[in-house]
UniProtKB/Swiss-Prot annotation:
Protein name: General stress protein 9
Alphabetized UniProt keyword annotations: Stress response
Induction field: By heat shock, salt stress, oxidative stress, glucose limitation and oxygen limitation.
Domain of life assignment: Bacteria
Length: 10
């Protein structure tokens, strides 16, 4: 869902 953490959080 957020910038680079979208990789983990989507």
């Amino acid at each position: 869902s957020r910038d680079i953490v979208s990789v983990y959080d989507d």
